[in-house]
């Protein structure tokens, strides 16, 4: 008889544990830093820092240092002989006046467009944004043909009516404010339209039912609710007015009215160009822009202390203008004629003439397309069109590609120092365009990379200028 015994399972012997070798801290940091995500983030941060800071560094270096060392001689040449008071007065009057006009027009038009049953809404909207589409230099030239004291069409129309007692003069500080304010008002309009659309009109209705008057409701309810949008509009218009060049150059220089941008242009046009004096003027303009940002931030310190919440089915109800509707309709048509129809008409009229002449039957009979034919035959025109298309497409693609990664880094990631990337991205917003151009000239005049005077330096300038808008 065979006896079967139950055998015990064999014990599993674990493999020997290798001795613990502590990883060097630097190795761990290097392994974490060499991941693809980290490398991409570092590259984007480096590009943003280069675009934002390097031009400013070279601008300050070229302003305060020359071949002998540290110097402030450029400031003496730029602001000496009492020039600083005149520059500050003209620049602040121009910027503040244009901001006040554009803010008044843009906010009023946005309120009428969104919150009332204003007539001609399609015409109203077109008239409110078309000036933004017209390039600033063309818009300024159109107003020269309209309101010049010598050849202005408006003066030709109103002169016989007033017996030449009233003459429009666009070549003045008031003309500069008028043209810049009209051209900038669409920016305010677009910002305020969004603000008014998101505001609950029942708050205004409640105030009216409680006995408040319309001016009281506007001052105590409406404007406080849209205060953040108002301050954003003020900041943007102040900076764009300070950096404006076409309007001061075309309208101010003829009457000897200098602002910072036109003075920088004048200094650079002298021979030999005084780069230190131009840099000193650019530093002053930059300080003005930074001061404007600081004041705007100070005023906005309490702008986010409250908010309104509406349901999904919320739709703002338009306010009935009643007997004022025809009056508002006339105002809208007049505004459209002044800001859109008249400038475009005078540009078209002038383009069909061999040389400018006042309208008459003989002039209309001599109109032709010879100017357009001459432009199409110019090789420079084809090159300009090609360069414009290449710069537009390349700038938009490059900025969005880089800033999309930067926005993800700021919003979605947990990487330390991401707030620095966000702050660097908005540095070009407070750098006036002429200052940025001068800064880039300081950089690439000294650079061994031969891109000065090529399309690539324009690409770098555009990418730097529009970098904040992609964030």
Where are these regions (language model features)?
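Short glycine/proline-centered loop/turn elements that form peptide/ligand docking sites
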Residues: 199-202
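Glycine/proline-centered hinge or cleavage motifs at structural transition points of membrane proteins
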Residues: 210-212, 224
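Glycine-rich helix-loop "coupling/hinge" segments at transmembrane-helix boundaries
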Residues: 148, 246-272, 359-365
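Membrane-water interface segments at the C-terminal ends of transmembrane alpha-helices
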Residues: 36-68, 80-197, 225-246, 250, ...
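Transmembrane alpha-helical segments of polytopic membrane transport and secretion proteins
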Residues: 1-45, 215, 296-334, 416
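A short amphipathic helical element positioned immediately N-terminal to and/or at the very start
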Residues: 26-29, 70-80, 367-376
């Amino acid at each position: 008889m065979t006896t079967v015994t139950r055998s015990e399972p064999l014990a599993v012997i674990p493999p020997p544990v290798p001795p613990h070798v502590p990883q060097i801290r630097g190795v761990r940091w290097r392994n974490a830093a060499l991941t693809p995500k980290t490398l991409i983030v570092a590259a984007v941060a480096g590009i943003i820092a280069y675009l934002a800071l390097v031009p400013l560094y070279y601008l300050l270096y070229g302003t305060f240092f020359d071949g002998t060392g540290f110097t402030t001689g450029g400031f003496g040449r730029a602001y000496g002989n009492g020039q600083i008071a005149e520059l500050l007065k003209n620049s602040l009057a121009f910027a503040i006046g244009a901001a006040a006009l554009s803010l008044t027009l843009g906010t009023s038009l946005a309120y009428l467009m969104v919150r009332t049953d204003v007539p001609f809404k399609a015409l109203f909207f077109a008239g409110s944004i078309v000036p933004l589409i017209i390039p600033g230099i063309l818009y300024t030239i159109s107003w020269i043909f309209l309101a010049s004291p010598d050849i202005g069409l408006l003066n030709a129309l109103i002169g016989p009516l007033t017996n030449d007692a009233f003459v429009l003069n666009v070549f003045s500080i008031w003309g500069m404010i008028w043209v810049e304010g009209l051209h900038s008002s669409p920016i305010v309009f677009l910002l305020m339209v969004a603000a008014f659309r998101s505001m609950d009109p029942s708050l205004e209705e409640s105030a009216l039912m409680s006995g408040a008057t319309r001016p009281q409701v506007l001052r105590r309810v409406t404007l406080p609710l849209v205060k953040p949008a108002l301050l954003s509009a003020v900041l943007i218009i102040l900076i764009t007015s300070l950096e404006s060049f076409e309007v001061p150059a075309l309208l101010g220089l003829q009457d000897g009215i200098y602002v910072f941008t036109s003075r920088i242009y004048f200094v650079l046009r002298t021979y030999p160009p005084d780069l230190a004096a131009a840099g000193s003027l650019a530093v002053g303009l930059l300080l003005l822009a930074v001061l404007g940002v600081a004041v705007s931030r100070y005023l906005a310190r309490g702008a986010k202390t409250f908010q309104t919440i509406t349901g999904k089915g919320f739709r703002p109800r338009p306010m009935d203008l009643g007997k004022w509707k025809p009056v508002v309709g006339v105002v809208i048509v007049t505004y459209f004629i002044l800001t859109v129809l008249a400038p475009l008409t005078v540009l078209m009229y002038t383009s069909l003439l061999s040389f400018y002449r006042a309208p008459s039957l003989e002039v209309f009979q001599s109109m032709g397309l010879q100017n357009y034919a001459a432009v199409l035959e110019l090789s420079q025109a084809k090159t300009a069109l090609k360069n414009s298309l290449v710069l537009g497409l390349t700038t938009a693609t490059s900025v969005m590609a880089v800033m999309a990664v930067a926005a993800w880094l700021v919003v979605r990631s947990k990487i330390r120092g991401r707030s620095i990337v966000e702050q660097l991205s908005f540095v070009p917003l407070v750098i006036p365009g002429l200052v940025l151009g001068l800064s880039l000239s300081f950089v690439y005049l000294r650079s061994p990379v031969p891109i000065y005077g090529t399309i690539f330096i324009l690409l770098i300038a555009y990418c730097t200028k529009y970098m904040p808008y992609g964030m």
